From Swiss-Prot:
Chain sites annotated for binding Zn(2+) 1: C54, C59, C76, H79
Composition bias, Polar residues: 163-174
Induction conditions: Negatively regulated by microRNAs miR156 and miR157.
Source organism phylogeny: Eukaryota, Viridiplantae, Streptophyta, Embryophyta, Tracheophyta
Residues annotated as binding Zn(2+) 2: C95, C98, H102, C114
UniProt cross-references to Pfam families, sorted A to Z: SBP (PF03110)
Compartment(s): Nucleus; Cytoplasm
Gene transcribed to yield this protein: SPL4
Stated name of the protein: Squamosa promoter-binding-like protein 4
Residue ranges, compositional bias (Basic residues): 118-127
PROSITE patterns linked: ZF_SBP
Amino acid sequence: MEGKRSQGQGYMKKKSYLVEEDMETDTDEEEEVGRDRVRGSRGSINRGGSLRLCQVDRCTADMKEAKLYHRRHKVCEVHAKASSVFLSGLNQRFCQQCSRFHDLQEFDEAKRSCRRRLAGHNERRRKSSGESTYGEGSGRRGINGQVVMQNQERSRVEMTLPMPNSSFKRPQIR
């Protein structure tokens, strides 16, 4: 029995080694794919690791230590919050809604979202506030589980409540 136990443990060690080896080859393949992407976008690769720079012209901010959001969109925190940056020969601003750079003409004054996205946001806000008595997305329900709706003139909704003398008893929630 002792021989079987040691034989079984050896088998497990070999199997775990194989799993580790598979994981190493998977990560190597992912790194090669990442390098190919960088090579296509920047023209050359950095052998010490993937090249992570802000996409703004002449910005040398190292994105390795940046937050995931900034790495994902390839923009450093300074340029994401800047009122204007020089990118591709144009003055642009980073839109928080689109997560892209747009021309300055697409923004209202010092806003951080472009007009197109703000218009959609405002439309959704107006649409939902007119439909519900309790405000935008509150999720409050009326009688019989139906959402209490207001009419076009925003009149009051009539509700009939049980008489105080009746035998109606409220259930106590514990």
